[in-house]
Amino acid sequence: MKTLATIGDNCVDIYPQLNKAFSGGNAVNVAVYCTRYGIQPGCITWVGDDDYGTKLKQDLARMGVDISHVHTKHGVTAQTQVELHDNDRVFGDYTEGVMADFALSEEDYAWLAQYDIVHAAIWGHAEDAFPQLHAAGKLTAFDFSDKWDSPLWQTLVPHLDFAFASAPQEDETLRLKMKAIVARGAGTVIVTLGENGSIAWDGAQFWRQAPEPVTVIDTMGAGDSFIAGFLCGWSAGMTLPQAIAQGTACAAKTIQYHGAW
């Protein structure tokens, strides 16, 4: 099985209604979910020298993630206020903290050389690394979330093997966007559709996957777990539809409890 590292965002998700805080963020979540499939991933991110930063590093280590490049910086760890409305998470105030200045060092790049797959997301300030990583032969994946107006759709996709995004539902406008993304150089684009499943375009055909019927407790981490399940499936040699099915199953597991993991 191939090796995987994530780079970029982390945050502590604070649930005032539950009086609890959970470690999270796309790069952190994807790394943790990959451990479900026997992968020991690495993660490059920045945390503050506060209690939340200590918590996040301890949580990652406990879950089996290599935290040697989770760097502690002076300041506060990124934080997101989260409310639950009918078991769906609604994001409130966000404090970016030390992540506002995140950038990879030359030593970080050297450390990434050992990994086959590198993933990041649109919040992680990691997009500048992808041309170099892709040119070095890494399999690259990037999550655009629902930011369809981002200029990165024009500049970043030629350096991506997998472009992930989210949308409410499938329609002709979405399908045309997906075709254009692959035409600009992305290998495959995969869009999660919440309760409507997911759709992928690989340049030859569309692939659709229905969601698994489960009782939803909290949708936090659903998209991140889909990405992790998919990438682990692909790294193990699964076909595209098989990897999508594994991503769907991983997301179904995650949404049945509070917090990302």
From Swiss-Prot:
User: What triggers production of this protein?
Assistant: Induced by fructoselysine and psicoselysine. Makes part of the frl operon with FrlA, FrlB, FrlC and FrlR.
Q: What does this protein do?
A: Catalyzes the ATP-dependent phosphorylation of fructoselysine to fructoselysine 6-phosphate. Functions in a fructoselysine degradation pathway that allows E.coli to grow on fructoselysine or psicoselysine. To a much lesser extenst, is also able to phosphorylate psicoselysine.
Keyword Ligase in record: no
InterPro entries assigned: Carb_kinase_PfkB-like, Carboh/pur_kinase_PfkB_CS, PfkB_dom, Ribokinase-like
Q: Which gene encodes it?
A: frlD
Q: Which Gene3D superfamilies match?
A: 3.40.1190.20
Q: Which UniProt keywords apply?
A: ATP-binding, Kinase, Nucleotide-binding, Transferase
Database matches in Pfam families: PfkB
Q: Which GO terms describe its molecular function?
A: ATP binding; carbohydrate kinase activity
Q: What is this protein called?
A: Fructoselysine 6-kinase
